[in-house]
């Protein structure tokens, strides 16, 4: 870790600790807020689940109540059907059509009521399943109508898929239901038939329990109890149809109560075999059991509240009649009064035993209810404590997770800071290298600028020289052109003068010849014909003055002199000649002056001295020298122009290089400034990162200490609990 800059002010330790405490308090407040939100969400979800469970329990209780009511209705129909068949067979062996229709209408009415109730229940279940997306319910809500409160699915499946009823059971049950008095008469006829009746009654009770009992098969004790009740009732002297119905109803009520107790005991034994009772407590509905017990108690109280005096009276008074009727039915056997008294004692003993067994069953049922309520309370307390511990555990886990997340984030930030520091240091090294390279380039550019300035100065000097040379060349060209013009004019004048001289000589000769011919013609009287007249024709025009004959050329010269007499023309020609001569002299003077100027410039003063004599050779040599000098000057001029073009190109190239170097130097300066600013910024960021790292290390140590304290507190709480 690098050292901070010298001019940086470090924050005091107290301020840093206060900032850390504030940060920790902020983190704790945020964690508490998140935890409170989480707890609220959990509480809301728990309330929703409880409401859903209550609703399902209500629906299940309604379903079970309707199912039990349907079973009770079916049982009542069967009992009434059996009672009616018993009465009809005892009193009216043949029924009328109206009675049969009334019985059928009553049964069908009750069946329709049960069917309507079951259809309403199925429609309610169907609508609920569709409204809630056919979600999975518990196994209790999907049981069949044949299943009872504590019905075992295995027994139900075995009952549904197996057919345990045999022909013997069918015959026995049909015989019992169709003609119970016949069995009673046969019982009175012989004591052996009494035992057969007991066996048939026990078998009928077994079959009836297997058919109408939805709570599973009966135990042998229950079968023996039911058979003993029937046998005692049959053997009593005051046995009537009402007593039979009351006994059957009381037997059914006690049987339902015992079946509920036994089914609950079987359920708890099965649940103990499967696992624990607490996990299966939710499958038991206490209100249904209590309602069933209340119903069975009411039925039992209604059936067994008759006074014992009636039983005793009915047992003592018609003993002789019964014995006489039995004796009349079977004359071969006689019943002893001692045996009847012993049988009555046995019957009362059996009744006492039955009441004791029922009392024990009721006591066991109450104890079972109390234990079940205690188990439910313990289960609720355990669930509450478990929920609290779970909440505390989740809170601690959440705090640990948040602290782990904070530590991981700080570690990631540390790694990110280290990586950024390395990247910035590498970038700084690259920028330093680029700065050194740019400094070297800048030095080269400065050297190029210096060379450019030198070249510009040299170019300016050359340009001045070229300007002076071009001016001189231009002047020389002008002078040469002017001299060429003058020379051409002088040559023309010279030729013209030579022509004039020749013409003058010719004219003089012709004049002399003419004078001689005139003299001779005057002497002889002849006329000279000019040469230009063809065929010897003579012009008949009148000639003013004397007659003169001249040549063709002389005539042209005279015509060019103008009109007038020959003397006037000759005087004109003589004046023009003098003028031409004066012009020639002037031109010669000017030529000499120009030659003197040229001789001063080229140092050829001595060469022009011979021109005064008018020699043509010297003039030709001078002309050649002038032409040679002109060609040399032209060559120098073309060379100078080429040098000028090359220099201009090099100047433009150097100017472009200078511009590029200037832009590069400016960019380098900008980059250097940016690099310096970036370096300062990186140094500041490095210092802030180091400060943050130190603060994070201190906060990390504080958080680790707090985490250790929380772990110690948690272990202490767990040890206390």
UniProtKB/Swiss-Prot annotation:
Molecular function as annotated in GO: LRR domain binding
Regions annotated as coiled coil: 22-49, 349-524, 566-714
Residue segments, region Disordered: 232-262, 295-338
Positions of modified residues (Phosphothreonine): 331
Pfam families, A to Z: LRRFIP (PF09738)
PTM remark: Ser-190 and Ser-202 are phosphorylated in response to LPS stimulation. Ser-202 phosphorylation regulates the LPS-induced interaction with MYD88.
Tissue/organ expression: Widely expressed, with highest levels in heart and skeletal muscle.
Residues with the Phosphoserine modification: 18, 190, 202, 309, 312, 320, 324, 328, 332-333
GO BP terms in the entry: regulation of DNA-templated transcription; Wnt signaling pathway
Keyword Phosphoprotein in record: yes
Keyword Phosphoprotein attached: yes
Superkingdom to which the source organism belongs: Eukaryota
Keyword annotations from UniProtKB, A to Z: Coiled coil, Phosphoprotein, Wnt signaling pathway
Start-end of Polar residues biased regions: 237-251, 305-338
Family: Belongs to the LRRFIP family.
Subunit and partners: Interacts (via N-terminus) with DVL3. Interacts with FLII. Weakly interacts with MYD88 in resting cells. Following LPS-stimulation, the interaction with MYD88 is rapidly enhanced; the complex gradually dissociates to basal levels after 6 hours of stimulation. Interaction with MYD88 is regulated by LPS-induced phosphorylation at Ser-202. In the presence of LPS, competes with FLII for MYD88-binding.
Purpose: May function as activator of the canonical Wnt signaling pathway, in association with DVL3, upstream of CTNNB1/beta-catenin. Positively regulates Toll-like receptor (TLR) signaling in response to agonist probably by competing with the negative FLII regulator for MYD88-binding.
Name by which UniProt lists this protein: Leucine-rich repeat flightless-interacting protein 2
UniProt organism field: Homo sapiens
């Amino acid at each position: 870790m690098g050292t901070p800059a010298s001019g940086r002010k470090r924050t005091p330790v107290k301020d840093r600790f206060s900032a850390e405490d504030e940060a920790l308090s902020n983190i704790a407040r945020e964690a508490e807020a998140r935890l409170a939100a989480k707890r609220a969400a959990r509480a809301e979800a728990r309330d929703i689940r409880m409401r859903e469970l209550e609703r399902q329990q209500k629906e299940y209780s309604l379903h079970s109540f309707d199912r039990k009511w349907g079973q009770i209705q079916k049982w009542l129909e069967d009992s009434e059907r059996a009672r009616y068949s018993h009465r009809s067979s005892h009193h009216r062996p043949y029924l009328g059509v109206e009675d049969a229709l009334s019985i059928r209408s009553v049964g069908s009415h009750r069946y329709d009521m049960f069917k309507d109730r079951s259809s309403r229940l199925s429609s309610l279940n169907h609508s609920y399943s569709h409204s809630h997306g056919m979600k999975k319910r518990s196994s209790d809500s999907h049981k069949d109508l044949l299943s009872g409160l504590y019905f075992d699915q295995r027994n139900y499946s075995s009952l549904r898929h197996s057919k345990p009823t045999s022909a013997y059971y069918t015959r026995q049950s049909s015989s019992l239901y169709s003609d119970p008095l016949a069995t009673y008469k046969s019982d009175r006829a012989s004591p052996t038939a009494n035992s057969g009746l007991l066996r048939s009654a026990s078998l009928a009770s077994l079959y009836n329990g297997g058919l109408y009992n939805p709570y599973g098969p009966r135990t042998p004790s229950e079968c023996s109890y039911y058979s003993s009740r029937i046998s005692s009732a049959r053997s009593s002297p005051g046995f009537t149809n009402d007593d039979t119905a009351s006994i059957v109803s009381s037997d059914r009520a006690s049987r339902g109560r015992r079946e509920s107790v036994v089914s609950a005991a079987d359920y708890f034994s099965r649940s103990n075999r499967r696992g624990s009772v607490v996990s299966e407590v939710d499958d038991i509905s206490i209100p249904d059991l209590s309602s069933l017990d209340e119903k069975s108690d009411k039925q039992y109280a209604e059936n067994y509240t008759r006074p014992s005096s009636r039983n005793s009276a009915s047992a003592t008074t018609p003993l002789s009649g019964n014995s006489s009727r039995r004796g009349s039915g079977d004359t071969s056997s006689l019943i002893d009064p001692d045996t009847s008294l012993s049988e009555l004692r046995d019957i009362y003993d059996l009744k006492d035993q039955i009441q004791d067994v029922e009392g024990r069953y009721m006591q066991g049922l109450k104890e079972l209810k109390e234990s079940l309520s205690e188990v439910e309370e313990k289960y609720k307390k355990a669930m509450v404590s478990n929920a609290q511990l779970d909440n505390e555990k989740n809170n601690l886990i959440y705090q640990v997770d948040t602290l782990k997340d904070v530590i991981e984030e700080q570690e990631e930030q540390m790694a990110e800071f280290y990586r950024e520091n390395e990247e910035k240091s590498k970038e700084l090294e690259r920028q330093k290298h680029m700065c050194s390279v740019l400094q070297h380039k800048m030095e080269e550019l400065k050297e190029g600028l210096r060379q450019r300035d030198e070249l510009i100065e040299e170019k300016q000097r050359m340009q001045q020289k070229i300007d002076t040379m071009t001016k001189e060349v231009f002047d020389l060209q002008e002078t040469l052109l002017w001299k060429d013009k003058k020379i051409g004019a002088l040559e023309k004048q010279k030729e013209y003068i030579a022509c004039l001289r020749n013409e003058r000589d010719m004219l003089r000769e012709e004049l002399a010849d003419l004078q001689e011919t005139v003299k001779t013609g005057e002497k002889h009287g002849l006329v000279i014909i000019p040469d230009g007249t063809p065929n010897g024709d003579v012009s008949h025009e009148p000639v003013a003055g004397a007659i003169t004959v001249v040549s063709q050329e002389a005539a042209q010269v005279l015509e060019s002199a103008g009109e007038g007499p020959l003397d006037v023309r000759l005087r004109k020609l003589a004046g023009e000649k003098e003028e031409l001569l004066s012009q020639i002299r002037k031109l010669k003077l000017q030529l000499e002056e120009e030659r003197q100027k040229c001789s001063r410039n080229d140092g050829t003063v001595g060469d022009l001295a011979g021109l005064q004599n008018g020699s043509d050779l010297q003039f030709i040599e001078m002309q050649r020298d002038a032409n040679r000098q002109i060609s040399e000057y032209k060559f120098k001029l073309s060379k100078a122009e080429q040098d000028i073009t090359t220099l201009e190109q090099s100047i433009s190239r150097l100017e472009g290089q200078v511009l590029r170097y200037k832009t590069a130097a400016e960019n380098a300066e900008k980059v250097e400034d940016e690099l310096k600013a970036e370096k300062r910024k990186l140094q500041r960021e490095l210092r802030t990162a180091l400060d943050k790292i130190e603060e994070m290390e201190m906060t990390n140590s504080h958080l680790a200490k707090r985490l250790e304290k929380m772990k110690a507190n948690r272990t202490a709480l767990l040890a206390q609990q």
